[in-house]
Amino acid sequence: LKVNNNSRFTNLYSSNEVIRIPIAHAEGNYYVDKKILKSLKDNDQIIFSYCSENGDITKKSNPNGSLLNIAGVTNKEGNVVGLMPHPERVSEKVFNNIDGIRFFKSIINYHNY
């Protein structure tokens, strides 16, 4: 996933950082109409995008046909998030990947200001 770190859910990631978080959504994908998509982009609400290991956003790196490779979005206020990846599945060292822990720590970090 490529991260947009401009949210209370992703503020501890680097800008455009590429992370590995598993998905488990069968045939689900993200779709909205053009008006909502424009609003999401204009308001910087897309916080996760499916990408290659190098951070390239391509059709090949999109596992489910999600519109614009979208994997996670926030509402306009930035206090609600919806995402397909499961950061809780990579938030402890026992999983051999802790890319997800910063998702949760970002929320704490935001509220400790």
List PLM regions with ranges:
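Amide-donor transfer/coupling interface in amidating biosynthetic enzymes
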Residues: 1-113
